[in-house]
């Protein structure tokens, strides 16, 4: 298993993963359908630069992901990360994917 940051080179594998996740567990997804073109567009949009998706990969396929955002408080300079999404395909759960 290896990890990659979501980018334009692996976005198609990411979309395939989302489709599979939607098929297997539609109630776990936060959308009704996968906006493929929207995903591709957001990867090039500077607004989303502070959002990062790390993909867990096996055999050139995405099996899990974590999305997080860095932000800080102006008042005290406190820096933090907010994890907004963690999802691992059911057949890869309980194998340490999310811990890595």
Predicted feature locations:
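Conserved GNAT-fold acetyl-CoA-binding loop/helix
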Residues: 2, 22-42
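A short beta-loop-alpha structural element at the N-terminal edge
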Residues: 2-16
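Short strand-connecting beta-turns/loops that link adjacent beta-strands
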Residues: 8, 48-49, 59-61
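Alpha-helical elements of Rossmann-like donor-binding domains used by nucleotide-donor carbohydrate transfer enzymes
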Residues: 13-20, 38-41, 100
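A short helix-loop-beta-strand connector motif used in the catalytic cores of GNAT acetyltransferases and
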Residues: 43-55
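Conserved beta-strand in the GNAT
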Residues: 53-55, 61-70, 82, 87
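A conserved beta-turn-beta hairpin within the catalytic core of GNAT-like acetyltransferases
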Residues: 71-83, 93
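Conserved acetyl-CoA-binding loop-helix of GNAT-fold acetyltransferases
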Residues: 85-88, 94-100
């Amino acid at each position: 298993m290896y990890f990659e940051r979501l980018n334009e080179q692996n976005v198609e594998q990411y979309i395939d993963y989302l489709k599979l996740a939607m098929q297997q567990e539609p109630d776990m997804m936060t959308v009704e359908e996968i906006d493929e073109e929207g995903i591709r567009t957001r990867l090039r949009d500077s607004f989303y630069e502070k959002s990062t998706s790390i993909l867990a990969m096996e055999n050139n396929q995405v099996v899990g992901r974590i999305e997080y955002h860095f932000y800080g408080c102006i008042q005290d300079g406190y820096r933090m990360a907010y994890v907004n999404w963690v999802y691992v395909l059911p057949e890869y759960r309980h194998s340490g994917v999310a811990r890595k």
